[in-house]
């Protein structure tokens, strides 16, 4: 069976930092680091992924590349006295994924457009880059396209801020195949349950409760 162009593009992007792609990605990252955090580009870097997510080379579709800083939250260190453990500056990660953060920043930059989807394009030691597909819901070419005209309806306004994109649904644990397991919310609930079960202060009233009661409180 003859394989098309998109198949070979996808194969290259499975290992973007190996072989001939390594030199190309190095040149791209050097250039991208000097650019603004949010920049509009003419064509998608990953054509196969963009087309799979609904992109079309026609009026009304816009591609934006967004740079997001890697890592957890950058909390300001308190200047009042407390234990270092209670400072609240380390170990706090956002509940949103970096991809969803990139989508929201692109939507704020272009408030008249709607976010269709996004995909990963690269990273270095400090940043990650995503390309966000934006759609103009008021453009005639979009409103008359049977594949994408659903986004022109009023219930899809500001959809990225309501967790209705693919990244937003993943963050909310709405994947049909996996459900809540292994999502950020699942890990948070599991950690809360571990904290309640752990007897850190034997003198406290809750430390001597049976584990069945503690587990029931955690589920509530």
Curated annotation (Swiss-Prot):
Belongs to the eukaryotic ribosomal protein eL15 family. Keywords: Ribonucleoprotein, Ribosomal protein. The lineage of its organism: Archaea, Thermoproteota, Thermoprotei, Desulfurococcales, Desulfurococcaceae. PANTHER family: LARGE RIBOSOMAL SUBUNIT PROTEIN EL15, RIBOSOMAL PROTEIN L15. It comes from Staphylothermus marinus (strain ATCC 43588 / DSM 3639 / JCM 9404 / F1). One of its GO terms (molecular function) is structural constituent of ribosome. The keyword Ribonucleoprotein applies. This is Large ribosomal subunit protein eL15. It comes from the Archaea. One of its GO terms (cellular component) is cytosolic large ribosomal subunit. One of its GO terms (biological process) is cytoplasmic translation. It holds the Pfam family Ribosomal_L15e. Coiled coil: none annotated. NCBIfam families: PRK04243.1.
């Amino acid at each position: 069976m003859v394989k098309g162009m998109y198949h070979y593009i996808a194969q290259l992007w499975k290992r973007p930092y190996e072989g001939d792609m390594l030199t190309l990605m190095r040149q791209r990252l050097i250039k991208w680091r000097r650019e603004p955090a949010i920049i509009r580009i003419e064509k998608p870097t990953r054509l196969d992924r963009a087309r799979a997510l609904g992109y079309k080379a026609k009026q009304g579709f816009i591609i934006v590349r967004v740079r997001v800083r890697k890592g957890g939250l950058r909390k300001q260190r308190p200047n009042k006295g407390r234990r270092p453990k209670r400072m609240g500056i380390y170990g706090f990660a956002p509940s949103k994924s970096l991809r969803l953060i990139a989508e929201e920043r692109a939507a704020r930059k272009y408030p008249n457009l709607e976010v269709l989807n996004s995909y990963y394009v690269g990273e270095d030691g400090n940043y990650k880059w995503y390309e966000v597909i934006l759609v103009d819901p008021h453009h005639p070419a979009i409103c008359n396209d049977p594949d994408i005209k659903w986004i022109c309806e009023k219930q899809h306004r500001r959809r990225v801020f309501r967790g209705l994109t693919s990244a937003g649904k993943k963050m909310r644990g709405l994947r049909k195949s996996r459900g809540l397991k292994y999502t950020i919310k699942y890990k948070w609930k599991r950690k809360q349950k571990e904290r309640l079960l752990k007897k850190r202060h034997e003198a406290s009233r809750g430390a001597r409760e049976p584990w069945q009661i503690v587990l029931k409180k955690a589920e509530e």
